[in-house]
Curated annotation (Swiss-Prot):
GO terms for molecular function: nucleoside triphosphate diphosphatase activity. The record marks 12, 70, 154 as: Important for substrate specificity. Its EC number is 3.6.1.-. NCBIfam families: maf. It is an enzyme of class 3 (hydrolase). The lineage of its organism: Bacteria, Pseudomonadati, Pseudomonadota, Gammaproteobacteria, Enterobacterales. Belongs to the Maf family. YceF subfamily. It catalyses: N(7)-methyl-GTP + H2O = N(7)-methyl-GMP + diphosphate + H(+). This is 7-methyl-GTP pyrophosphatase. The gene is yceF. Nucleoside triphosphate pyrophosphatase that hydrolyzes 7-methyl-GTP (m(7)GTP). May have a dual role in cell division arrest and in preventing the incorporation of modified nucleotides into cellular nucleic acids. InterPro entries: ITPase-like_fam (IPR029001), Maf-like (IPR003697).
Length: 194
């Protein structure tokens, strides 16, 4: 049975994969994440998830390698990590009363036989109308400077939303576990069977 590798150094993705109670290792993929000028957000996350998984194939032959990538889209534009409090406030002002869509690309690459499975999962976050005071307090309390969209849905960010729409709530955090379980089963690695 091939061993499992998560092509990521993200603590959030690691924590999500740990929910499946299967043994895995993490490894940093080496991929240029620069978007191409002609790529849609869906195409970008699909390409990067695939490249991340395949980039580790020579280091991990005979493994199942998981690649994942996510972008946040508001008004047709990819929204990155804010990195500063002012940028976080600006992103939240733009999101207020709007829908922010997250696209998460998922790839499972079997480095033993070259079989690749991919999927893109959308997830919509409906923001309620936020006051300036609410935005300021949220940024001060949560410090979402390294989170695309300037919020942490798994934390205090839940207070910002009217509703969430998507197939799998784990997708919003960065790893669609329902889709991943389906892919793993197709490779003969059912999480429920050890």
């Amino acid at each position: 049975m091939p061993k499992l590798i998560l092509a990521s150094t993200s603590p959030w993705r690691r924590a999500l994969l740990e929910k499946l109670q299967i043994s895995f290792e993490c490894a940093a993929p080496e991929v240029d994440e620069t978007p191409r000028s002609d790529e849609s957000p869906r195409q970008l996350v699909l390409r990067l998830a695939q490249e991340k998984a395949q980039s580790l194939a020579s280091r991990y032959p005979d493994h199942l390698i998981i690649g994942s990538d996510q972008v946040c889209v508001l008004d047709g534009e990819i929204t990155g990590k804010p990195l500063t409090e002012e940028n976080a406030r600006l992103q939240l002002r733009k999101a207020s009363g709007n829908i922010v869509t997250f696209y998460t690309g998922l790839a499972l690459f079997n480095s033993a036989n070259g079989h690749l499975q991919t999927e893109v999962e959308p997830f919509d976050v409906h923001f309620r109308h936020l006051s300036e005071a609410e935005i300021d307090n949220y940024v001060r309390k949560e410090h979402p400077l390294h989170c695309a969209g300037s919020f942490k849905s798994e934390g205090f960010g839940i207070t910002l939303f009217e509703r969430l729409e998507g197939r799998d709530p784990n997708t919003l955090v960065g790893l669609p576990l329902i889709a991943l379980c389906q892919m793993l089963r197709r490779e003969g690695k059912n999480p429920l069977m050890g």
